[in-house]
């Protein structure tokens, strides 16, 4: 199913694929811990889908494997116990806990509809991968914090295995240091926080239980909609799935552009003094274009990063001078907003605590030779300032 979303078509005839999978299941029947079918859901998340969409589309793909392989003469028990689900985990802390809990509940409902002989066949095996969509190439050490909170969400949610993406994976081959930190996050959660010692630690929490029910209900509605269209493959080939993901991605992009959704280090609180290193290439900040009915994973911060990299590599960094005057509290508040605004584009910021008069500020601004001067003051103070064009 992964190749369908990446290329828009299967690499080989579907009938041959499922016959081959059925043969693999029979050959590995005695190896109870070997799972030969991987259902990948992180592709949806990393392409901009919502949590509900990722869950519904992943379940639909898993159900299609179940049905097609049962048509090859296998029982529901034989197939279900060979499926491994892989989903992304974002920084939406409690929502991600609820997503994995909802996934287990819904998958159990799907499998039990086919009346398995063993109840354990309805158990979902889940692998989580920390988000690549929200990683940033500027101020990359923030990615360590993202990966840690995401790993914690997944562990509390009760996943079986976990991959923490190294903090520098977005722009280079991970260094030994980045790989070590990624591994140690899991070890710390296990050996120091003991998250592996409690079964469903989120169980009983009204907030998380309520979130779980809400996500499960919405995902089930979307799952049924996919089934009504003929199943995962039919829904995908009709463009239904790709259109839904692209619409969600567009909404996320708008929220990031307007800073309704915050990506630290990219569209809010950037490192003012950071300059892109040689390891950062234009390809790392260029959003891939999806061709036809395909999904193209990207990172939410790419638009800001591309703009900033262009400024960094231009040879001359423009400067923005903060001319703060009038009411101190409002002047500093607007200066902070303006500093963040310009720094997101890689423009060098010259911040100033406060000027006693507009004349003093103008003199300092002219001496700085900044290309941009931002007057930071309250609305009332701004109405008293007269700025004339140079003659």
Say what each PLM segment does.
Residues 1-154, 167-183:
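Helix-rich catalytic cores of soluble enzyme domains
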Residues 320-375:
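Generic long, charged, amphipathic alpha-helical segments
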Residues 37-42, 86-90, 127-131, 147, ...:
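Generic beta-strand/beta-sheet core signal
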């Amino acid at each position: 199913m992964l190749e369908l979303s990446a290329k828009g078509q299967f690499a080989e005839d579907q009938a041959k694929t499922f016959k081959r999978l059925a043969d693999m299941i029979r050959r590995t029947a005695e190896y109870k811990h070997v799972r030969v079918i991987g259902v990948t859901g992180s592709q949806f998340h990393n392409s901009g889908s919502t949590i509900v969409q990722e869950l519904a589309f992943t379940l639909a793909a898993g159900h299609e494997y179940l049905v097609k392989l049962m048509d090859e003469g296998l029982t529901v028990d034989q197939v279900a116990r060979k499926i491994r689900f892989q989903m992304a985990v974002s920084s939406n802390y409690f929502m991600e806990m609820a997503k994995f809990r909802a996934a287990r509940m819904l998958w159990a409902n799907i499998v039990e509809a086919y009346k398995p002989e063993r109840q354990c066949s309805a158990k979902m095996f889940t692998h989580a991968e920390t988000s690549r969509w929200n990683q940033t190439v500027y101020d990359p050490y923030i990615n360590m914090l993202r990966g840690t909170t995401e790993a914690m969400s997944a562990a509390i949610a009760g996943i079986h295995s976990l991959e923490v993406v190294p903090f520098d994976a977005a722009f280079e081959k991970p260094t030994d240091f980045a790989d070590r930190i990624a591994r140690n996050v899991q070890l710390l959660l296990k050996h120091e926080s003991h998250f592996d010692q409690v079964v469903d630690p989120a169980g009983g929490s009204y907030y998380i239980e309520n979130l779980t029910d809400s996500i499960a209900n919405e995902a089930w509605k979307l799952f049924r909609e996919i089934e009504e269209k003929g199943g995962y493959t039919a829904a995908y080939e009709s463009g239904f799935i790709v259109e839904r993901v692209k619409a969600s991605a567009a909404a996320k992009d708008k929220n990031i552009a307007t800073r309704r959704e915050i990506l630290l280090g990219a569209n809010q609180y950037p490192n003012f003094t950071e300059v892109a290193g040689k390891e950062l290439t234009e390809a790392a900040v260029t959003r891939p274009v999806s061709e036809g009915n395909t999904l193209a994973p990207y990172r939410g911060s790419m638009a800001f990063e591309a703009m900033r990299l262009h400024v960094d590599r231009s040879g001359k960094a423009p400067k923005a001078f903060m001319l703060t005057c009038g009411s101190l509290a409002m002047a500093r508040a607007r200066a902070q907003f303006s500093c963040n605004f310009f720094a997101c584009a890689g423009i060098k910021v010259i911040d100033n605590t406060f000027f006693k008069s507009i004349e003093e500020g103008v003199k300092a601004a002219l001496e700085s030779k900044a290309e941009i001067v931002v007057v930071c003051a309250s609305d009332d103070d701004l109405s008293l300032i007269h700025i004339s064009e140079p003659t």
